[in-house]
C-alpha cells in the first residue's frame, strides 16, 4: 500500500497523456500526408495524360503502382515513428528482422517473385490498365496492376486476382489492330458470283459508315464447300476492342441485303 501511495501517479498520468497526444498527432499527420500524397500523385499523372506524355492505360497502370508504393512506404515510416515514440530502437527491430527473414525466407519467395515479375511486366509494357488480355484460363479487362497481384475483370463481371508470379504467358488483345471475321452460310444452289457481289457491296457500305474499321471489310472467298450450303468469309481490320461491334453490324447489314435481294414468296 505504501508503494501505491508513494508512486508518482500524477507523473504517470501526465506522461501517458503526453504520449497519447503525440500518438494522436502522428496518426493525424499520417492521414494528412497520405491524402495529400495521393492527390499529388493523381494530379501529376493527370497532367501526363493531358500532355500525351503517357497513354491513358499506361498512365493508369503506373499511377496504380506509384500509389501502392507510396502507401506501403508511408505505413513503414509511420510504424518506425511509433516505435521511436515508445522508445523502442527501430534498428534493433531491423536487425531482428534480418534473423527472422532467414527463417521465413523460403515462405517469402512467392512474395518476392510476385514483386519482381510485376516489375518486369511494367518494364516490358506487357499490359496496361484497360487492356483486354488472356492469362492462363482467365480473360478480361485489366483493372489494376499492383506490387503483388494483377486484377482482371471478366466480361461477366467477375474480378480475378492473379498473383504476378503466375503470369507466365500473356495474350494482349489490345495492341494494334484486331480482326473482325464473319462467316456467311448460303445455299449451294445460289449463284456464287452474285452472292459475293452482294456481300462486297455491304462491306463497302459498312466501311464508309464505321470509322472503327481500319482496313476492309473484304470478301475473302469460299471458306467451306458443302453439298447443301457453302460458307463465304468476310474479314476486316478494326481498332482494338471494336472487332465484335463490326462483326455484329456486318451480320445485320448482310441479313438486310439478303432480304432485299431474295424476298420470300408470299402465298
Curated annotation (Swiss-Prot):
InterPro entries: LSM_dom_sf, MS_channel_1st, MS_channel_C, MscS_beta-dom_sf, MscS_channel_2nd, MscS_channel_C_sf, MscS_channel_TM-2, YbiO_bact. One of its GO terms (molecular function) is mechanosensitive monoatomic ion channel activity. The chain crosses the membrane at residues 13-33, 66-86, 101-123. Disruption phenotype: Cells lacking this gene grow normally in minimal medium or in high-osmolarity environments, and exhibit the same survival capacity as the wild-type strain upon a drastic osmotic downshift. They sporulate and germinate normally. Combination with an MscL mutation enhances the osmosensitivity of MscL mutants subsequent to a hypo-osmotic shock. Induction: Expression is sigma B-dependent. Induced by high salt concentrations. Signal peptide: none annotated. One of its GO terms (cellular component) is plasma membrane. Pfam families: MS_channel_1st, MS_channel_2nd, MS_channel_3rd. It is found in: Cell membrane. Keywords: Cell membrane, Membrane, Transmembrane, Transmembrane helix. It is a multi-pass membrane protein. Coiled coil: none annotated. May play a role in resistance to osmotic downshock. Belongs to the MscS (TC 1.A.23) family. This is Uncharacterized MscS family protein YkuT. It comes from Bacillus subtilis (strain 168). The gene is ykuT.
Amino acid at each position: 500500500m505504501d508503494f501505491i501511495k508513494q508512486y508518482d501517479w500524477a507523473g504517470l498520468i501526465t506522461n501517458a497523456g503526453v504520449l497519447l497526444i503525440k500518438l494522436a498527432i502522428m496518426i493525424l499527420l499520417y492521414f494528412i500526408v497520405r491524402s495529400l500524397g495521393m492527390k499529388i500523385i493523381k494530379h501529376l499523372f493527370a497532367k501526363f495524360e493531358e500532355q500525351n506524355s503517357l497513354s491513358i492505360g499506361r498512365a493508369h497502370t503506373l499511377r496504380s503502382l506509384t500509389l501502392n508504393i507510396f502507401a506501403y512506404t508511408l505505413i513503414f515510416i509511420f510504424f518506425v515513428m511509433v516505435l521511436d515514440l515508445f522508445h523502442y530502437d527501430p534498428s534493433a527491430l531491423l536487425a531482428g528482422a534480418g534473423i527472422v527473414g532467414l527463417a521465413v525466407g523460403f515462405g517469402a519467395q512467392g512474395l518476392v517473385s510476385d514483386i519482381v515479375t510485376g516489375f518486369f511486366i511494367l518494364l516490358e509494357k506487357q499490359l496496361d490498365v484497360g487492356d483486354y488480355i488472356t492469362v492462363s484460363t482467365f480473360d478480361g479487362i485489366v483493372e489494376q496492376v499492383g506490387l503483388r497481384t494483377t486484377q482482371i475483370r471478366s466480361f461477366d463481371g467477375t474480378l480475378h486476382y492473379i498473383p504476378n508470379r503466375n503470369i507466365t504467358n500473356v495474350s494482349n488483345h489490345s495492341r494494334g489492330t484486331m480482326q473482325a471475321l464473319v462467316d456467311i452460310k448460303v445455299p449451294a444452289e445460289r449463284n456464287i458470283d452474285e452472292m459475293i457481289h452482294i456481300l462486297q457491296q455491304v462491306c463497302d457500305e459498312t466501311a464508309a459508315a464505321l470509322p472503327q474499321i481500319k482496313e476492309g471489310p473484304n470478301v475473302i472467298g469460299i471458306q467451306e464447300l458443302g453439298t447443301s450450303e457453302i460458307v463465304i468469309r468476310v474479314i476486316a481490320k478494326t481498332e482494338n476492342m471494336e472487332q465484335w461491334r463490326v462483326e455484329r453490324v456486318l451480320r445485320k447489314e448482310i441479313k438486310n441485303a439478303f432480304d432485299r435481294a431474295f424476298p420470300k414468296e408470299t402465298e
